[in-house]
């Protein structure tokens, strides 16, 4: 058996493809032995990340979203990398949301970080965004 399983997916930056990515990654997580609660967390995080990519590329069908999901059997870790071709943004402005002043939008990254074991964000204005999310089999 290989030490890593890798699934690569490139989809148009359209809302209809959010579910395709979610189903693909959740099927991989199930195959690798994640429990239902962890799979649901992964599905919510994927939905948030891919929806953000679609929104920030303005649903431009010529723009693509690249997804790489990999599971390492030694570290027992699922890693999901999502890259878009959007405008990027200045990540220094990201703040912890004030729950008492909730508004529509702005919670995606907060939700992703609360559900996944590790999250790394690489974004530069004018160069798109890459988010890498990790979930360990059996929790932290």
Regions found by a protein language model. Give the residues of each.
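Residue-level detector of secondary-structure transition/capping positions
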Residues: 29, 47-50, 86
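Bergerat-fold GHKL ATPase/HATPase_c domain
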Residues: 1-44
């Amino acid at each position: 058996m290989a030490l890593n399983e890798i699934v690569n997916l490139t989809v148009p930056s359209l809302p209809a493809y959010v579910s395709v990515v979610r189903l693909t990654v959740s099927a991989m997580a199930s195959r690798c032995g994640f429990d239902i609660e962890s799979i649901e967390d992964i599905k919510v995080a994927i939905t948030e990340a891919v929806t953000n990519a679609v929104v920030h590329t303005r649903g431009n069908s010529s723009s693509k979203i690249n997804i790489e999901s990999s599971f390492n059997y030694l570290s027992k870790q699922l890693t999901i990398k999502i890259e878009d071709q959007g405008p990027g943004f200045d990540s220094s402005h990201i703040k912890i949301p004030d729950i008492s002043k909730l508004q529509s939008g702005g919670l995606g990254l907060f939700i992703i970080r609360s559900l996944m074991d590790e999250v790394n964000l690489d974004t530069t204005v004018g160069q798109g965004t890459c988010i890498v999310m990790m979930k360990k089999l059996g929790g932290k």
